[in-house]
From Swiss-Prot:
Gene: CCDC138
Protein's UniProt keywords contain Transmembrane helix: no
Keywords in alphabetical order: Coiled coil, Phosphoprotein
Protein name per Swiss-Prot or TrEMBL: Coiled-coil domain-containing protein 138
Coiled coil: 198-323
Listed Pfam families: CCDC138_C, CCDC138_cc
Phosphothreonine modifications at: 48
Species assigned in the record: Homo sapiens (Human)
Modified residues (Phosphoserine): 49, 469
Length: 665
């Protein structure tokens, strides 16, 4: 940006008027030089002082200062002019101008700083004006001298003299000086106006400076606020990131929990489907059995009706044959009397060794065929062996169905047989009954089984025997055959199991379970329990419907869990689907007695120690039921809590510290 030179208003006009008035312009070569001198001097000042131009460029203050300097330069030749006019008159004006020109030229060559030289010349010119004014005005009055001196000392102050006094002063001065004075007075007024403008501009600059300071402070406050906002934004972003991470972790945790719940739901659904299929199968079997029972009832009624018809026909034919005989009535009476005691006539076999031979065969069949059926079933592989074995099993079951009524009838002869032969006979009956468990229920066997159970429970009592030979006669002495109440432990144990299989009366079953618990307290009783595979017999009564017997059933199983050599075989015998299904159904029963639950938890705790049983626990969801019972059980029931925690720990569902915490209270 180039510096801007501001000239005081009217400067060029004043200089030109002075030049024209004093004959310095135009025709005279000397005057031409004088004007050229001032022009060249002015141009040189504006071009040779870049520092001053840089300082005062583009500013009103700078322009006003330049104007004051130039006015001083204009007054310098005028001051010298006043001096030469007063001393040498007007004739020597040109010489004084030429001398002044030479003097200023020498000063400009010597001086380095233009601003210093101009200030010195200005001060010198004012002093010369004062010196010239003093001798010229000695003849005038004192007020006029004071007025002139005041005007010379303070050219920037406004003139306070009235116009009349100024006119008087002009009249006393020469005409040219008066004009110069007027022009100087006008310049003075203009300078005052410029000073006022400069003061006003300075005030505006001060206001602008204060405004800029306020804006700067406001800007600083805004910057501080922005910095605080940035800090808050960073903190908000950090908190948001933390919350986002927490949210992601929580979502992941809930996703895992949802997956576990879905797995558990799938397991429950599969178990429910399995139970539903089993229920449908049982319903189908029940319908088939009902249909078969209905057909058999119809057939039995037909047979009974036919039998009645045959009896009537036989009686009618007999009467017709004996019609002419006088003994007809007597024979009819004898026939009726013979029909009743036919079933009650007991005859002793001529050879007692036949029973011994039969008992040997019974032992052999029981030990090597009937009792081995389930073991062979578990060992079969492939479809053909299974089909072959199924046919064999059906044949065995049919034979057992045919033999059991005959065996029940033979119980009436047991009082007349050696007591040692009772055990093989009862064992054969027991294993025949066990064969019927795997097959369909036979409605025709209901009455036979009930009679068999009552005879085994009560025993057989007979008054005596009759022999056809007149040589032998036996006194009618009562004889008994005790089975359930026998003093022989193996016979009593087998009789108890038969009673549990056949009898439905609650009082008979309660006495049977009491006898079984007493027998299981001995080591021989536990061995017999395992030998005769009594677990399925006991499990048939382990249901919530028989609440009165439930405690006795659990007690009999609990006797087998006592530490002995029979414990491990008993646990292996219980490690099957039948036992775990029965326990699962029992645990689902609402409001199960606390004592029964504690006893059952002991058995489950011992079964959980076998690793292979973990699959059975999971298959029948017993572990979930135990967890639910553990959650809802009162902590005051410490024994139950300890057993549940131990069972869950063996299954790998809880940690060791849970056992310690539960046992500590």
């Amino acid at each position: 940006m180039e510096p801007r030179v501001v000239k005081p208003p009217g400067q060029d006009l004043v200089v030109e008027s002075l030049k024209s008035r004093y004959g310095l312009g135009g025709s005279c070569p000397d005057e031409y030089d004088f004007s050229n001198f001032y022009q060249s001097k002015y141009k040189r000042r504006t071009l040779t002082s870049p520092g001053d131009l840089d300082i005062y460029s583009g500013d009103k203050v700078g322009s006003s200062l330049k104007y004051s300097d130039e006015s001083k330069h204009c007054r310098t030749p005028l001051g010298s002019l006043f001096k030469h006019v007063n001393v040498n008159c007007l004739d020597d004006e040109l010489d004084s101008f030429h001398d002044l020109k030479k003097q200023e030229t020498e000063e400009e060559l010597i001086e380095n700083d233009y601003r210093v030289s101009t200030s010195k010349i200005t001060k010198q010119s004012f002093k010369e004006i004062e010196k010239v004014a003093l001798p010229t005005n000695t003849t005038s009055s004192r007020p006029r001298t004071e007025c002139c001196s005041d005007a010379g000392d303070s050219p920037l102050k406004p003139v306070s003299c009235p116009k009349s006094k100024a006119s008087d002063k002009r009249s006393l001065l020469p005409h040219q000086i008066s004009q110069i004075y007027d022009e100087l007075f006008q310049i003075h007024l203009k300078l005052q106006c410029e000073t006022a403008a400069q003061q006003k501009f300075a005030e505006e600059l001060q206001k602008r400076e204060r405004f800029l300071l306020e804006r700067e402070q406001l800007l600083f406050r805004h910057e501080n606020a922005l910095s605080k906002i940035k800090g808050v934004e960073e903190e908000v972003l950090t908190r948001f990131q933390i919350i986002k991470e927490q949210h992601d972790a929580e979502v992941e945790h809930l996703t895992e929990v949802l997956k576990e719940k879905n797995k558990e739901t799938k397991r429950l659904r599969s178990s429910f489907d399995a139970l539903k299929e089993l229920n449908d199968t049982l319903k189908k079997q029940l319908n088939e059995a009902s249909e078969e029972n209905r057909k058999i009832d119809i057939q039995a009624k037909r047979v009974q009706a036919r039998l009645d018809n045959l009896q009537r026909k036989y009686e009618f034919m007999t009467i017709q044959r004996l019609k002419g005989s006088s003994h007809a009535v007597h024979e009819m009476k004898s026939l009726k009397q013979e029909k009743a005691p036919v079933s009650k006539t007991y005859k002793v076999p001529l050879n007692g060794q036949v029973y011994e031979l039969l008992t040997v065969f019974m032992d052999w069949i029981s030990d090597h065929h009937l009792s081995k059926v389930k073991h062979e079933e578990s060992g079969m592989d492939g479809k053909k062996p299974q089909l072959k074995f199924a046919s064999q099993r059906n044949d065995i079951q049919e034979k057992c169905v045919k033999l059991l009524p005959l065996m029940t009838e033979q119980l009436q002869w047991m009082p007349f047989v050696n007591i040692k032969l009772h055990e093989p006979f009862v064992k054969f009956i027991y294993w025949s009954l066990r064969q019927l468990d795997a097959g369909a229920q036979h409605s025709t066997m209901t009455s036979t089984l009930r009679r068999l159970g009552e005879d085994i429970f009560k025993g057989v009592v007979t008054k005596g025997i009759q022999d056809n030979s007149p040589q032998h006669s036996v006194e009618n002495k009562p004889k008994t055959a005790a089975f359930f109440k026998s003093s022989n432990l193996p016979l009593r144990f087998l009789s108890t199991l038969i009673v549990l299989k056949t009898v439905t009366q609650a009082d008979y079953l309660a006495q049977a379970f009491d006898s079984l618990c007493l027998d299981l307290k001995t080591e021989e009783g536990k061995t017999l329990f395992l030998e005769y595979q009594a677990v399925p017999v006991i499990l048939s009564h382990l249901r919530i419907s028989s609440k009165g017997l439930l405690s006795n059933v659990i007690d009999s199983l609990l006797q087998m869990t006592v530490e002995s050599k029979s414990l491990q075989p008993f646990l292996e015998a219980c490690s099957n689907s039948l036992f775990f299904r029965t326990c699962s159904v029992l645990l689902r029963a609402p409001k199960l007695d606390l004592q029964i639950l504690e006893k059952l938890s002991i058995i489950l705790q011992k079964l959980s120690k076998i690793k292979s049983n973990k699959k059975l626990f999971e298959l029948f969801t017993i572990h979930l039921m135990l967890q639910e019972i553990q959650r809802t059980t009162n902590p005051e029931h410490a024994f139950l809590c300890i057993n549940l925690n131990s069972t869950l720990f063996n299954l790998g569902l809880t940690k060791c510290n849970s056992l310690v915490s539960s046992a500590s209270p």
